[in-house]
A protein has these predicted regions:
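Long, low-complexity, charged/polar intrinsically disordered regions in eukaryotic proteins
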Residues: 2-80
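Nucleic acid-binding interface residues in structured DNA/RNA-binding domains
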Residues: 111, 131, 136-137
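Charged, low-complexity intrinsically disordered segments and flexible loops
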Residues: 35-38, 98-99, 136
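Short helix-coil junctions and helix-kink-helix linkers
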Residues: 82-109
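A short, conserved structural fragment
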Residues: 119-133
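Long Lys/Arg-rich low-complexity intrinsically disordered regions in nucleic-acid-associated proteins
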Residues: 42, 75, 86, 110-111
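Compact DNA/chromatin-associated regulatory and scaffold domains in nuclear/nucleoid proteins
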Residues: 96-99, 116-120
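Short, hydrophobic-biased segments on the C-terminal half of alpha helices
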Residues: 59, 112-116
């Protein structure tokens, strides 16, 4: 996908990104004043928060995985498909020993919103199909 992302990733000038299928727009910025630092994702009127360390942890995990991995995005109250980025982002086996999402009730959908930012930052390759998209490390 051609990188048409606007913004610099600050609260005043957030990145404006699109979901992997390209059907929805959202904004995201990094909040380094939070402890630990967070990614703040605005989707319409909904604000999601994820641990910013995922920007390093996801590419590291994908390099170890060694191939394409399905995104598997799912809401918090729905189970994530095994072997997907979404399942990894909730797993007690990941580097944070659980959820990367920080806002209770809104911790899911990690695989919908974080990979487009990682793609923009040049850390991953991301598919942009209507559904069943995958990602791999660069």
């Amino acid at each position: 996908m051609t990188d048409k992302v606007k913004g610099t990733g600050t609260a005043d000038d957030p990145w404006v990104l699109r979901t992997p299928p390209g059907t929805s727009e959202f904004s995201m910025h990094r909040d380094d004043s939070a402890d630990p630092p967070e990614l703040v994702c605005q989707v319409g009127s909904t604000k999601l928060r994820y641990l910013a360390r995922c920007l390093d942890d996801v590419p590291t995990m994908l390099k170890k995985h060694g191939d394409w991995m399905e995104l598997g995005s799912a809401d918090e109250n729905k189970p994530a498909k095994d072997g997907t980025v979404e399942a990894w982002a909730r797993s007690p086996e990941n580097p944070v020993k659980g959820w990367y999402g920080l806002r209770k009730g809104y911790r899911g959908r990690f695989a919908m919103y974080v990979p487009p930012l990682l793609e923009h930052l040049g850390r991953v390759e991301l598919e942009h199909n209507a559904k069943n998209n995958r990602v791999r490390a660069r």
